[in-house]
Regions:
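Bacterial N-terminal signal peptides
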Residues: 4-14
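C-terminal and inter-domain tail/linker signature
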Residues: 19-172
Length: 172
């Protein structure tokens, strides 16, 4: 009898933990979607509401105010900034997304965002679309860490700020 009770208790705890993990993962997916949907509306406050107070974006700038500076600069430089989530994978406290990011260069960057290559650069008026991978780490239902891999050189080429790579026929 004792074995049966212990087994039932253990199964209940394990099932509860699995359900909690599933609930947390689903919640994290929803927060990630909200974060990028807010981005598409240039809704900085909506984005900041999804972050922990000490959230890190590549380690700096730290916290919500650091994110606010970055987001202000992105939306000034690219007022039509758009992120399309193409694919999302979530497990536990991590959500990874493959995205198409686009925008039109209409403002002057003031802080080193997007690899720092647009600081002080006059707007080209040109549109870009590149691929990004975003990895979000969550703590207590909020984004605590944001890592991204971007095609900054591809963006700069599309904006006309970096020459195209040499082709075999013209590289001699």
């Amino acid at each position: 009898m004792r074995f049966v009770l212990v087994s039932i208790f253990a199964a209940t705890v394990a099932f509860g933990a699995a359900a909690q993990t599933t609930d947390d993962t689903k919640r994290n997916e929803n927060v990630a979607r909200h974060f990028f949907e807010s981005s598409n509306r240039n809704d900085i406050e909506g984005m900041l509401s999804d972050l922990t107070e000490d959230a890190k974006n590549f380690g700096r700038p730290v916290g919500r105010e650091g994110f606010r500076m970055v987001l202000n600069d992105i939306f000034t430089t690219f007022p039509d900034w758009h992120v399309e989530v193409v694919e999302m994978v979530a497990k536990g406290d991590s959500v990874v997304m493959r995205c198409k990011v686009s925008g039109t260069h209409r403002g002057v960057g003031k802080i080193p965002v997007n690899g720092g290559m647009l600081v002080g650069v006059a707007p080209t008026g040109k549109h870009f679309e590149t691929d990004h991978i975003h990895w979000l780490k969550f703590r207590d239902g909020k984004i605590a860490d944001h890592y991204a891999t971007r095609d900054d050189i591809g963006m700069m080429r599309q904006l006309g700020l970096v020459p195209p790579p040499p082709t075999p026929s013209n590289s001699k």
